[in-house]
Amino acid sequence: MISKINFVKMHGLGNDFVIVNKRDLSSSYDLSQLAKNMAERHTGIGCDQFIIYEEHNDFYEMIIYNIDGSSAKLCGNATRCLAKLIYLDTGKQDITVMVGNKKLLCNVNDENNISVNVGSVSFNEAWMPNRDKVWEFAERYMIDLKETICVDIGNPHVVIFSKLEPQDQKIVGERLQAKELFADGVNVNFAEVKDNKIYLSVWERGAGLTLACGSGACGSFAAGLKRGFIHSPSTIVFKHGNLTMKEENGNIIMQGAATLVARGEYYCEQ
């Protein structure tokens, strides 16, 4: 039996998503498998993450799946995309998005300028692996741990301010997913600071290297502030555009564009 699923394809600075309203899904779908199928770039629609959303009385619930079918706890770029989609469909400009118990306050200033208040971040390193293991790993790849910091923005990030070549970023990103280092994996940010800007590339847990990462931008901005490398406001630079970041009363606010690519129907065999 073949069923149709309405979907929207969007991206934030090249970080792309397939977005589906929960009302268009039957309860019989295996959502993890559906995410893997729709995310496949050759036989599906293709995306970095698969997003399901549902409208409630005063907020929208967002569920995030990685391309390997695992779940994610936060995605800043997907939040901006969802806020823009809701704005286009309803005209709402102030939108609250819930991901688990994380509340994200969004404002659509215009179609190309969406801000998301992601709240506060935590530098509690309770989820960090044994320091000896980290030192051994860092020495192997010539990473300066004095310029490396862990930050939890709703999902875990390691921010590395040492300069690594792209091929080394891939290796380090992959190998930091080892269970003996981070039991649940980790998002790895490679940050280079110039003139109060952070030039950023991110290895996302469950997705690999992506063209942009909103939660990585928030975590790296917070880490840069803590280390004194930058001041607020600042700019995060990705390959396909920038995000403006600022800190207000302990909250991190991200601002940038989101792009609608397509609306369509996906044919799903059940």
From Swiss-Prot:
What keywords would UniProt list here? Amino-acid biosynthesis, Cytoplasm, Isomerase, Lysine biosynthesis
Question: What PROSITE patterns does the database record attribute to this sequence?
Answer: DAP_EPIMERASE (PS01326)
The catalysed reaction is: (2S,6S)-2,6-diaminopimelate = meso-2,6-diaminopimelate
BP GO annotations = lysine biosynthetic process via diaminopimelate
GO molecular function, a single term: diaminopimelate epimerase activity
Q: Which residues form the active site?
A: 75, 213
Subcellular localization, as worded in the UniProt entry: Cytoplasm
What family, per the record? Belongs to the diaminopimelate epimerase family.
> What protein is this chain from?
Diaminopimelate epimerase
The upper taxonomy is: Bacteria, Pseudomonadati, Pseudomonadota, Alphaproteobacteria, Rickettsiales
Q: Which gene encodes it?
A: dapF
